[in-house]
């Protein structure tokens, strides 16, 4: 009930400043009795996926809590899973500000953050302090100054450091804001990366005596042929899941709107149909061989149901959470 008033105040601020202010407050309460201020009781609706049991099918998408600073406070809101990151081996500032823009009328966001984060070691320390009892995903990427040809080394470094603490590991090769990153989605580059990741997963499984599933996050801007090739590679390399989708470079649904021409990835409602169509095509191609986590423009129960009807086993929210707040979590989990 209160969120529309909170949103009105936050939307008076620059988008990144609003995010920083919100996280400043969440950091103060995370892991303390004051978490009760944001706690919501949601029904248990367990889902088995990637060998894990999720308390409910709704997760928080990567990008909101990049450094894992507010895991417990976000968990108290009712998410069945939380995906933190994207994190890189070394800290990096990301792209120059301003780099986050609202498209208020479309309930969309454009970001060109550029994997700003405090590095994987810092994230691991934050995860160690958390008491969240849902599934914790950790989304990993490469540093901006790491050549794409050596990009797989960054993923392997992150895997080593997070493996003991992750419920699952998400491989981000689809952000449009790190130069060259999306080229890792194609052909030989993808095969090389997935081979290295599976070998590392096998080694770490032996070392830690536990199996941590791997999901690959893909872009919504893949052609039909590219999508078929990606699906084939994921199956051949025994990847455990696929997250569809990341943000889009397509601006066709937001032409003429304020901020529509900003460089970066578009998320929120304008991405909804495009991501659902990718999920549908991907589901047909995979034919049940690995599960899909659906993300992109989910801002209602209906939108969440559409993702599941298209073939997703689980769903995630980000922009919808910014525009609708914690009540959206309870609404989706209750009625999905």
UniProtKB/Swiss-Prot annotation:
UniProt: substrate binding residues: 66, 111-115, 172, 177, 246-247
Residue positions binding FMN: 62-66, 86, 139, 172, 217, 245, 268, 297, 318-319
Annotated membrane topology: Peripheral membrane protein
Keyword vocabulary terms for this entry: Cell membrane, Flavoprotein, FMN, Membrane, Oxidoreductase, Pyrimidine biosynthesis
Cofactor(s) essential for the protein: FMN
UniProt keyword annotation of Manganese present: no
Functional pathway: Pyrimidine metabolism; UMP biosynthesis via de novo pathway; orotate from (S)-dihydroorotate (quinone route): step 1/1
Reaction catalysed by this enzyme: (S)-dihydroorotate + a quinone = orotate + a quinol
Subcellular localization(s) per the UniProt record: Cell membrane
Transmembrane region(s): none
GO molecular function terms listed in the Swiss-Prot or TrEMBL record: dihydroorotate dehydrogenase (quinone) activity
EC numbers: 1.3.5.2
GO terms for biological process, alphabetical: 'de novo' pyrimidine nucleobase biosynthetic process; 'de novo' UMP biosynthetic process
GO cellular component: cytoplasm; plasma membrane
Keyword Flavoprotein: yes
Active site per the UniProt annotation: 175 (nucleophile)
InterPro entries in UniProt: Aldolase_TIM (IPR013785), DHO_dehydrogenase (IPR050074), Dihydroorotate_DH_1_2 (IPR012135), Dihydroorotate_DH_2 (IPR005719), Dihydroorotate_DH_cat (IPR005720), Dihydroorotate_DH_CS (IPR001295)
Cofactor binding mode and count: Binds 1 FMN per subunit.
PANTHER family tied to this protein: DIHYDROOROTATE DEHYDROGENASE (QUINONE), MITOCHONDRIAL, DIHYDROOROTATE DEHYDROGENASE (QUINONE), MITOCHONDRIAL-RELATED
Subunit structure as annotated in this protein's UniProt entry: Monomer.
Family: Belongs to the dihydroorotate dehydrogenase family. Type 2 subfamily.
Function comment: Catalyzes the conversion of dihydroorotate to orotate with quinone as electron acceptor.
Name of the protein in its database record: Dihydroorotate dehydrogenase (quinone)
Annotated organism of origin: Escherichia coli O1:K1 / APEC
């Amino acid at each position: 009930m209160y969120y529309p008033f909170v949103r009105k105040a936050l939307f008076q601020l620059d988008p990144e400043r609003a995010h920083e202010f919100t996280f400043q407050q969440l950091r103060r309460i995370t892991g303390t009795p004051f978490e009760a201020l944001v706690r919501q009781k949601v029904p248990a609706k367990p889902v088995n996926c990637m060998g894990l049991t999720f308390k409910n099918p709704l997760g928080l998408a990567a990008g909101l809590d990049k450094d894992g600073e507010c895991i417990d406070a976000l968990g108290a809101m009712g998410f069945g899973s939380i995906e933190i990151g994207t994190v890189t081996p070394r800290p990096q500032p990301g792209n120059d500000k301003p780099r986050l823009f609202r498209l208020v009328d479309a309930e969309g966001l454009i970001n060109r953050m550029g994997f700003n984060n405090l590095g994987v070691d810092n994230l691991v320390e934050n995860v160690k302090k958390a008491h969240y009892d849902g599934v914790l995903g950790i989304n990993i990427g490469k540093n901006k100054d790491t050549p794409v040809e050596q990009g797989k080394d960054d993923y392997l470094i992150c895997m080593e450091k997070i493996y003991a603490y992750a419920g699952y590991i998400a491989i981000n090769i689809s952000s449009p804001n790190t130069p060259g990153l999306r080229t890792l989605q194609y052909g030989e580059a993808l095969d090389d990366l997935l081979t290295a990741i599976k070998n590392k997963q096998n080694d770490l499984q032996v070392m830690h005596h536990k199996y941590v599933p791997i999901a690959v996050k893909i872009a919504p801007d893949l052609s039909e042929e590219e999508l078929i090739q990606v699906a084939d590679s994921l199956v051949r390399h025994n990847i455990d899941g696929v997250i569809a989708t990341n943000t889009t470079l397509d601006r066709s649904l937001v032409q003429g709107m304020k901020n529509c021409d900003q460089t970066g990835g578009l998320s929120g409602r304008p991405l909804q149909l495009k991501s659902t169509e990718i999920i549908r095509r991907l589901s047909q191609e995979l034919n049940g061989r690995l599960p899909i986590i659906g993300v992109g423009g989910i801002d209602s129960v209906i939108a969440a149901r559409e993702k599941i009807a298209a073939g997703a086993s689980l769903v995630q929210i980000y922009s919808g959470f910014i525009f609708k707040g914690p009540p959206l979590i309870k609404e989706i989990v209750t009625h999905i």
